[in-house]
Amino acid sequence: MISTLALFTLASVVFASPARRCTGTISSLDDVSSAVECTTININSFTVPAGETFSISAPAGATVNVLGNVTFGYKAWAGPLFELSGTGITFNGNGYTFNGQGDQYWDGLGSSGSTKPHPMMKISSSGTFTNLIVKNSPQQCFSFGNDATLMVSKVTVDNSDGNSANGLSNGKPAGHNTDGFDVSVSDLTIEDSTVINQDDCLAINKGSNIVFQRNSCTSGHGISIGSITSDVTVSNVQILDNTVKNNAQGFRIKTDASATGSTVSGIYYSGNTATGCTDYGVIIDQSYPSTLGKAGTGVTISNVTFAGTNTVSVASGADEVEVNCGSGACTGTWNWSGLKVSGGSAGSINYSGITGFTI
């Protein structure tokens, strides 16, 4: 027979609350451990000490409110600078700024130069993440590790200062490898956001059920699938109603020439506009890290669609469209009837399965 004490103990375990209905306030890293015991977490303005991660492991269903600007101290180290985890989290940036002080790190070399903390923002929560300005990420800005649905909206990645040279960059733009959103997860939507940077606005390396819509990408490398390495899958990706301005390319799929066992499928573009592309309007290239070199055959690409209206204009000297598929690696019919390109040179296409579009 189970004793009364045992039953009481069991009930205490079963009905214990995972977090207190209280408000925790963070004004320094010393406040974090007590604040994350509460279901409402408020972040005031403060400076994160150099070489430390501002890490919030929030209880399920918690709300995190940013109520002031946060600056991250300068130090050459691996990072990340900020980390958020938890299930069903509501993160409200309220228009405040997280400043990574990338201008103190930038040397025009990105990952090939001095050590820079990256990613700046490691988001492993599910739920919503909205209305935050992230300024001057030292290197890559956002990476995601959500294991359930995450909606990101009204986020600004402002690395515009990196477009100018500084004393370390030998006349080149100081920012480099400053990707906006690096994605290797599923069930992610990014919408109504702005990226000004010097690398990919969006880079999808693996994952499925990904939506990127109504975003603005300026001065970087455009919207990219890849680079795709071995034994990964990218599927069901929707690129909708985005504006790409003055990027190296508008829309790109790139796979490693040496990669094997990977698939890219169900990539759907609609309602996008790209202007001022300096290298390529649309490029699908299976020769990475070369550009338009000998294409590999170990990644299968299928069902790439341009629907509705996608308008792409390139600068003089740039190519409108380049498709460089490995032998037999691109499969099926790709309907590109929704793609309109202009400016520069026509480019070349080595895959016969594209319909509704010719160069």
List where the protein language model places each region.
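Fungal secretory targeting signals
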Residues: 1-21
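Right-handed parallel beta-helix/beta-solenoid
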Residues: 15-34
